[in-house]
């Protein structure tokens, strides 16, 4: 094999390696983009669950769930919420479990503080808006109330 042919082969190998690296980078970027789109869709889906939660709270606060007929109707109306929760679980989406635990500001936003001398500072005492993760990625931060003395 002559030197010129050897050089041509080496250049071709270098070109193929460069193209391979570009394809690999493009593929990784597409995966990241798709994951972000899925996260955005899940975030919108979570808003539907929030709406059910708010409605359920209002019904209970107004005492509209006292009669047996009302309870049955409410149970039927909340069935889509259960379906939605099952779908979220299928995609490894879970509520952040932070109630009664020390605040983790990487996954929570403090929306209010309350004094309580019987508890230590930074303990989450109320969740105003549930936070969610998908796998080990944060989808939505929890909005919480914590102790501050």
Regions found by a protein language model. Give the residues of each.
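A hydrophobic membrane-anchoring alpha-helix module
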Residues: 119-149
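Charge-dense, E/K-rich amphipathic alpha-helical interfaces
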Residues: 2-103
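Thr-Gly-centered strand-to-loop micro-motif
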Residues: 98, 114, 129
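Disordered, low-complexity tails and leader-like regions
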Residues: 63-65, 117, 131
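Sensory/regulatory domains in signal-transduction proteins
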Residues: 106-115, 134
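Short N-terminal secondary-structure initiator segments
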Residues: 1-13, 131, 135-138, 142
């Amino acid at each position: 094999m002559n030197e010129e042919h050897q050089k041509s082969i080496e250049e071709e190998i270098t070109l193929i390696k460069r193209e391979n690296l570009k394809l690999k980078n493009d593929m990784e970027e597409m995966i990241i983009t798709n994951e972000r789109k899925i996260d955005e869709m899940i975030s919108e889906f979570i808003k539907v669950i929030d709406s059910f939660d708010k409605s359920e709270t209002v019904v209970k606060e107004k005492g509209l769930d006292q009669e047996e007929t009302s309870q049955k109707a409410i149970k039927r109306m909340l069935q889509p919420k259960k379906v939605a929760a099952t779908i979220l679980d299928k995609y490894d989406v879970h509520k952040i479990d932070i109630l009664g635990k020390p605040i983790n500001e990487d996954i929570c936003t403090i929306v209010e503080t309350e004094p309580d001398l019987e508890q230590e500072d930074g303990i989450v005492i109320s969740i105003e808006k549930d936070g969610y993760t998908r796998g080990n990625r944060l989808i939505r931060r929890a909005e919480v109330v914590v102790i501050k003395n």
